[in-house]
Amino acid sequence: MTPKVFYISDGTAITAEVFGHAVLSQFPIEFEALTIPFVETIQKAQKVKQQINDCFITTGERPLVFHSIINPEIRNVIFSSECVDYDFLNTFVAPLEQHLGVQAKPLLHRTHGKSNHGYETRIDAINYTMENDDGQTMKHMDKADIILLGVSRCGKTPSSLYLSMQFGIKAANYPFTEEDMDNLKLPEALKRNKSKLFGLTIDPHRLHEIRQSRMENSRYSSLRQCRLEVKEVEMLYKKERIPFVNTTNHSVEEIATKILDITGLERHMF
């Protein structure tokens, strides 16, 4: 039977999800997960407790519960359910209080709420990235923190959005198209911002698979065209000394981490 998992919080549950995913990803099995945010009252906690207990009765196994609940009364209600409990925040808060000599003063939603000083930074970055996606405009490249380059469908847009949403980085991206291949070069707007350029590449066979699902049996999706574009773009990266990574079989999180590691871009943590 597939193990059941609950991610619970009196806030957004983002912290509980991130912690839980990081732990469970170490195990080569599938989990059935349910996220329950904003458990802010005893009444809501009692309902969640009943859900957990019902799950135990139905399956005969105690579900895993990852939570980041600040309110101790609400936390105790969840503790009393038939679950295997993993309390992310309080596991670390007490030792840190002792080490720092400072008592924690929890604020609900502090980590992901609007009150966070980085909220506007994140929103500005997301807006910038969406407005400068896929070379829609070249007018504001000077304002970018990074400009991702690559052929169509190599992962530019999801990587750009992840960088902006997760780290508040203004990430523009520019596509090299089929029409560019005869005389591939950097546009002037990119030349002016060469220090911000970062390339993405991909295995031609994987690119062929991705494009086939979008435009089957077209020149655009042919393996020959995919090989040509990847070859030409990689030659340009090397000629212009633009750093690049191969996105094949990597998640967007891994791609973004590689980009940050190579470029040394500042991460705005929220």
Curated annotation (Swiss-Prot):
It catalyses: [pyruvate, water dikinase] + ADP = [pyruvate, water dikinase]-phosphate + AMP + H(+); [pyruvate, water dikinase]-phosphate + phosphate + H(+) = [pyruvate, water dikinase] + diphosphate. It is an enzyme of class 2 (transferase). Keywords: Kinase, Nucleotide-binding, Serine/threonine-protein kinase, Transferase. ADP binds at G150, V151, S152, R153, C154, G155, K156, T157. Belongs to the pyruvate, phosphate/water dikinase regulatory protein family. PSRP subfamily. Its EC number is 2.7.11.33, 2.7.4.28. The keyword Cytoplasm does not apply. GO terms for molecular function: ADP binding; ATP binding; phosphotransferase activity, phosphate group as acceptor; protein serine/threonine kinase activity. Pfam families: Kinase-PPPase (PF03618). The keyword Isomerase does not apply. Bifunctional serine/threonine kinase and phosphorylase involved in the regulation of the phosphoenolpyruvate synthase (PEPS) by catalyzing its phosphorylation/dephosphorylation. This is Putative phosphoenolpyruvate synthase regulatory protein. NCBIfam families: PRK05339.1 (NF003742).
